[in-house]
Amino acid sequence: MNKHSLRARPRTLAIAVAATCAAFALAARADESAAASAEAAQAEAPAASADPSTPTVDQLSRVEVASKRSKLDEARNQLSPDTGSSVYSFSDADIAKLPLGDATPLNQVLLRAPGVVQDSFAAGGVHVRGDHGNLQYRIEGVALPDAVSGFASALDARFARQVSLLTGALPAQYGYRTAGVVDIHTKGDLDEDGGSVSVTGGSLGHREAAASLFGSSGNLSWYVVGSQLQTDEGIENPTASKKPLHDDSKQQRGLAYLSYLLDDDSQISLFAGVTNNRFQIPDVPGQSPTYTLANTPPLDSSDIDANQRERMGFQVLAFQSKIGAKTDYQIAFFNRTSDVHYLPDPVGDLTYSGVAADILRSNSAHGLQFDLTHRLNPQHTIRAGLFAQREVGYTGNASTVFPADADGNQTSTTPITIDDNSRLAGSTLGAYLQDEWKLNERTTINYGLRADRVDTVTAESQLSPRLGVVYDLAKGTRLHAGYARYFTPPPSEKIDQTSVAKFLGTTNALPSDANTAVRSERSNYYDVGVAQEIDDRWTLGVDAYWRDVRHLQDEGQFGSAFVFSAFNYSQGRIGGLELSTTYKNKSLTGYANVAVSTARARGIETGQFNFAADELAYIASHWVHLDHEETVSASTGLSWRYDATTQFSGDVLYGSGLRNGFANTTHLPSHTSVNFSVEKGFDLGGAFGKIDTRVALLNAFDRVYELRDGSGISVGAPQFGQRRSVYLTLTKNFSL
């Protein structure tokens, strides 16, 4: 196949899908609902009775609106199938049972799912099924574009009615970030007015305040939540001490969801989020400077003052409606801006690492997503969609360095400043067409085709077939299997366009030549699993997966800044096995997950300038473990509701250790963290009324463990897990 024919195919499928969508759009629309006139008639009617048990007009209106929203929510959910994939869900009740309740960071919520591996905050917090990142976040079915610092730290679990993690062989509508899809349904459909205020205080100067407000007025409903956190441990401690040095952080985030019913079949939704996070970069005492700065005394390593700021904002405007009785659709317009700014200590960074780099990475993206479902007949449901995105990224790098000889030895104590700025614009286009075929009462097949094209540092495209099968073997026993061809463009906000030539003859000279044209990852993914419902309380699950990869993407921290850059291995092999079980009754709930995985790759094919020659040579001839591979990971938890106002919870997190050493040839020791919490409600009477309290104890046995030791492929500073910490949370719920 020649190059031109490969490029033509995505356009052909896109035209076909667009034509299909247009045909549905031209169909006759169903008669408009008479809901508005009915509401007006109700508003004019006098009250029939003063009996408080008789529903008021306002209450009846709320019920009617809630019913309409429920139908629209169900229709929207049908736009996002999961046939053939693995799904692990957390309801808001499940999240409330975690040690920190709904104050649990979203990454830590996901850590309770099978196949999720813990890493440091700077590295993204978690890895799913052998991928470094490659997670897609969706709110009400709309994919959020990538952010420089990732969405996990931007989204708040308080906002979620349900969080689902989809993995495996995903249907054709899911593209680009496919290690896992974090699908979030919001609390925006509450049928009453109210809110909550909570405060949390605890170890290491942890001070957090949060508030939410929700309600409705006629056809308009809203849910708004915001929080502010201050802590003395914003990033993992690089030492084993209980209290890190220079690690303060201030984190602010807000999320809002608004929905307006236009009629029985249509609604407009707006959801938006903003974060503003500031971090001190923690210090390591007892180090000695490597370089000398003219007329400046040595700076103690515990007094280095480097900082980083991360900001992000997104907005999504979605219109949902239907055409006739068989067709539902949603079109969403989105916008996202984000930036990360590393501010070095001009003396400390320079004298200890030979470079003080003021680095700003910013990225903005906007586009649209269109999804359509047409129920052709009882056996076939056709789904189609389009995705288009335009983004612009900028990297500003003002590096102060020392002149150096060919061996990297400092030749002058007077530094020079080198500007290395770059701009990158790109676009992404995608289209899909798929059919959910109910072959019989036991068997459902979802087959489809996806076409994608990306233009950033390279122009690439791919046709991606998808196939998923679900078979009900017996009552309570369901088998699923799937195949997916994946196409993963590089995250443009993490493409490093460093100029190697500019830094020759300096203390920031790079070890090898550059290839900054990060390529799209291409993989064949196979997944098979079985779920067994023992009864209506207890379920078991087993899932196995394997992935063959070309141009495997990874990310690494190269330098002092907590900014990650993407690069490619030429080949990759990733696979694993997951076991899970859940149990739920009225007072006792529990879960347990165990996962075994392997993730290996060979041959660095882009970003070679970040690696030493001996490391490049070894990786070229050996299958090396990826730095985020953890052979065994496990989590288990138990929650017991003693009475209507008292709940006890606990969980255990285990990891066999991430990779370390030269070319990731060894791994860190295993680690276990045990966590407990007690939640108790009190009725204080008077103006205070009911108050909910929660005491949480994290890492109860104060285990000292390293997530990273600073060695390994593309690994930055050492990072230790959180030491024993105690938190007290007070929450006041109120009605309006």
Language-model segment annotations:
Residues 234, 645, 659, 680-736:
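C-terminal beta-signal and adjacent terminal beta-strands/loops
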Residues 39-52, 56, 64-74, 78-127, ...:
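Periplasmic N-terminal accessory/gating domains of Gram-negative outer-membrane beta-barrel systems
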Residues 153, 162-171, 181-216, 224-226, ...:
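Short strand-turn segments of transmembrane beta-barrel domains in outer membranes
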Residues 32, 231, 245-247, 265-322, ...:
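Flexible loop and strand-edge segments within Gram-negative outer membrane beta-barrel domains
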Residues 201-230, 241-282, 307-328, 376-379, ...:
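Transmembrane beta-barrel wall of Gram-negative outer-membrane proteins
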Residues 322, 328-342, 472, 494, ...:
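Membrane-embedded beta-barrel scaffold of Gram-negative outer-membrane proteins
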Residues 438-440, 541-548, 565-660, 731-733:
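Gram-negative outer-membrane beta-barrel transporters
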Residues 278-291, 339, 457, 475-525, ...:
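Surface-exposed extracellular loop regions of Gram-negative outer-membrane beta-barrel proteins
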